[in-house]
Amino acid sequence: MAEVTVKQLAADVGAPVDRLLKQIVEAGLKARSENDAVTSDEKQQLLAYLRKNHGEAEAEPRKITLKRKTTTTLKAGKAKTVNVEVRKRRTYIKRAELQPEPEAEAPAPEEPVQAPAAEQAPVEEAPKVAAEAAPAEAPETEAPAAAETEAKAAPEPAAESAEPAIAPEDIPMPPPEDEGRDRKPKKKKEKVRERGDDIEEGKPKKKQAGHRGPRSRPVEEPVVLSEDEEETTLRKPLRAKKKPKEKRHAFERPTKPMVREVQIPETITVGDLAQRMAVKSADVIKTLMGMGVMATINQALDQETAILVTEELGHKPKAVSEDAFEEEVLSEITGPDEGKEKIKRAPVVSVMGHVDHGKTSLLDHIRRAKVAAGESGGITQHIGAYHVETEHGMVSFLDTPGHAAFTAMRARGAQCTDIVILVVAADDGVMPQTKEAVEHARSAGVPIVVAINKMDKEEADPDRIKNELSALEVIPEDWGGDVQFVPVSAHTGMGIDDLLEAVLLQAEILELEASPDAAAKGVVVESSLERGRGSVATVLVQNGTLRQGDMVVAGSFFGKVRAMTDEAGRQVKEAGPSIPVEILGLNGTPDAGDEFFAVADEKKAKELAEFRQTREREQRLQRQQAAKLENMFENMGKDEVKTLNVVLKTDVRGSLEAITKALQDLGNDEVQVKIVSSGVGGIAETDVSLAMATNAVIFGFNVRADTASKRLVEQEGLDLRYYSIIYNLIDDVKAALTGMLKPEFREDIVGIADVRDVFRSPKFGQVAGCMVTEGTVYRNKPIRVLRDNVVIFEGELESLRRFKDDVAEVRNGMECGIGVKGYDVKVGDQIEVFDRVRVERQLESTGA
């Protein structure tokens, strides 16, 4: 140790210099001044003298008593409190420092045996003096076997001897984990835990505490306790506890934000988007509000909006097409068709043309049937599917409606056919639906065969038809084109065979093939809901063979084929390519034009159908929400739009679609049609109840209400109407909307009178003497006062007199006295009498 002066040593130990010089002399050292140096050996000699002089080596262990008083308040009621004072006293006894002699005398072989006792003896001493002890004393208790420890620890007792008053300051406050040690039941456990903490490093940590603690008690030296603690400590047997592990969560909070790749379909609800990003829905809604979009948790978002929200929240969006999932499922449930033998199949022919041009009558002659007579009003309102065995081969026909409302139906007919027969009346020429049929066929890429019908009439002019169609780029073969024109007569049967030959010739050019061994695949032509049969779908098989018992997916519906019938109503077990059949067993009525296919896995079929239903519902909700947002600001400040609520029930799905489209096209900015419910099948009580709740009109197209529904309609006084012709339904709705329009009034001038003089009457006040110059002046009609041909007042007549008599009217060329109510007229003014005439408005709509 480096030498220090007496003055420095006195400052270190905190004693006066004179006293320290006196103690140096008493210790037998050479006398010196305060600036003389003191060596390390002299320090040790001085320390030994001081210890001996103060009797520290032989004295009893030094005691330290700690007292603690805590005061708390307990509430014994609303207004009563009790003060509780807890007083605690602890006495810690520190034994003399361990001497190095016993350790030096102890033989080496005995070290493993004595190690537990030697190690645990200081453990007993440490809790009494500094179990929660000062860091300066920790090396003292942990290294009793080292001789050099005595030299290191020597200055500390010297300081303690010099100033014993600072001894209590060496004991720090307990660490946080032992704050509850002052509770009596825990005292013994704390001692065991302290003993376990000082086990040498070479032993495993499991031996620090636990049930092995009590086994080492016989080896321990007795623990000296104060009288206050002795009784409480020995009250219960010692039972050690495992040292509690550090209380930490197993999950550690990530230091960096989690960035996820979020798959976003075409439509997704706010709740689903929040779940995929692992954030709260409120955060997504808040972000949307910041972007100017007001949304709820169940509202559907489009893909672009969802991508913006995802990027705003710090995640990576990935746009996903819903068709990918559908195609994946389709590839799983429909096997590949490669390698299966293909055979020639019959052509599917769609008969199209303008209304009343003879399409159905032409088919009747081909099928030797009378279908047209069965159609209401003599017009076709459904797609009919038939297959005909002719001398030249089998042909499947689709008869489409010609009315303007059935545009979508005709488009579907063109999409699922191979050849289009365009029927044009020779006496009528090309009409709007004829042009539309040409456009449908051209957009579908289907060849056309023109049938010029009604050739038996005298006014038939086939050349005119050719000229008009050539303007639509339908060029006949004899004019150098590629379209066959066949003159026919559905009435006499002229040219029918030629027409079939032309169709089959066109089919040979197309080389139509199909594989009968593949899984059935085709298109839904029509669907309906029939009492006793359930959902009935007319399907056209385009490839494969459909058998009874097959699992079928059609649009968003699925089911097992329980029965199949042909167009004549005969039961069939299977249907090959190009054969139309009616199937029973679907769980709903699919839309006309939906694709159907037979599958082997019922689970996958159900999964695909439910996926399509969910997608349709989300798209519908999204359209409704978009319409609300678009019209929100447009409708602000405007009068409320009047709506005609309609409950619509039809016999087949195609008619439902056509009527719905036609009704939605009606209306304008003032009145609109709102279809609150629509469906296929008869009118049930639920439909009537809905009409009651929404104050709606019930329309039945080729369907009827049951007895209970009729009774409810009569009781509630609802409006129930049946229709079989689409014209009549649309006309009635148009008339109802017209009646809902605000009336317009036209002002007609009925008479003009010039003011010639003004005089005052005691009874009427100011009276104008007038001459009627035009028309007739009536007493009870509104008037205007004109001055210099400018209207300055508008009001009513207070009185109209001729001479002294009150009159109802004064004709042209006669004088009269006119009292104007609330206004003073002057000479030269004109009094104009007019009448307001109500003008009935007509509904202008694009769908009419």
UniProtKB/Swiss-Prot annotation:
Mind telling me which Pfam families this protein's record contains? EF-G_D2 (PF22042), GTP_EFTU (PF00009), IF-2 (PF11987), IF2_assoc (PF08364), IF2_N (PF04760)
Family assignment from sequence similarity: Belongs to the TRAFAC class translation factor GTPase superfamily. Classic translation factor GTPase family. IF-2 subfamily.
HAMAP family, sorted: IF_2_B (MF_00100_B)
- Gene that codes for this? infB
Tell me which residues bind GTP.
353-360, 399-403, 453-456
NCBIfam families per record:
IF-2 (TIGR00487), small_GTP (TIGR00231)
Name-wise, this protein is Translation initiation factor IF-2
Q: Which organism is it from?
A: Marinobacter nauticus (strain ATCC 700491 / DSM 11845 / VT8)
Segments for region (Disordered)? 90-253
Q: Which GO terms describe its cellular component?
A: cytosol
Which stretches does UniProt call biased (Basic residues)?
204-215, 236-248
Which residue stretches does the UniProt record annotate as biased composition, category Low complexity?
105-170
Q: Where is this region: G1?
A: 353-360
- Drop me one GO molecular function for this one: translation initiation factor activity
